[in-house]
């Protein structure tokens, strides 16, 4: 059973145990989660796919799904994830298939649930971090539109952007 703070934020998951760091990357992640509430790993593009960034700690701190986004540079992705974290601190919740423009003026984005089959490959640090939980942690992918504001599931979406963000809502 989770315990809620006076703000309604999740402060502790009953079966969560902080993992033990085995290297400097782990120590940095655990330090960031302790100090800021979350950490943002960035994975660079390679032959298997586009770059992506994701949160570690949103579920522990806020009871909110972790967030992943693809195809944006590290500084921009980090800015978006930190903006989401700032909104979570005020009690805002982002839900699947909820289009929003609160992250950037004139820029809408949407959120889709990430299929659990993608967790190990794309959210490996989250899998490590939450391994003590009896149930899988939730995760959402932030999906951004093409230059005309269309999303990948819309018929006129600019096909050139498909290579920058693989949709992870299906296996």
How does the language model describe each region?
Residues 53-57:
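A short, structured beta-strand/loop element
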Residues 2-49, 59-63, 68-171:
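Acidic, proline/glycine-rich low-complexity IDRs
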């Amino acid at each position: 059973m989770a315990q809620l703070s006076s703000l309604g934020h999740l402060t502790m998951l009953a079966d969560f145990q902080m993992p033990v760091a085995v290297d400097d990357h782990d120590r940095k992640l655990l330090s960031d989660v302790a100090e800021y509430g979350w950490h943002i790993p960035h994975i660079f593009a390679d032959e298997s796919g586009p770059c992506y960034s994701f949160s570690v700690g949103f579920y522990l701190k806020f009871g909110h799904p972790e967030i992943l986004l693809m195809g944006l540079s590290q500084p921009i992705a980090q800015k978006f994830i930190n903006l989401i974290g700032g909104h979570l601190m005020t009690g805002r919740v982002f839900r699947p298939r909820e289009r929003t423009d609160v992250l950037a003026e004139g820029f809408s984005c949407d959120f889709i649930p990430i299929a659990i089959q993608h967790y190990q490959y794309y959210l490996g640090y989250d899998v490590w971090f939450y391994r003590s939980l009896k149930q899988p942690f939730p995760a959402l992918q932030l999906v951004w539109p093409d230059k005309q504001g269309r999303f990948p599931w819309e018929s006129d979406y600019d096909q050139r952007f498909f290579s920058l963000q693989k949709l992870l809502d299906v296996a």
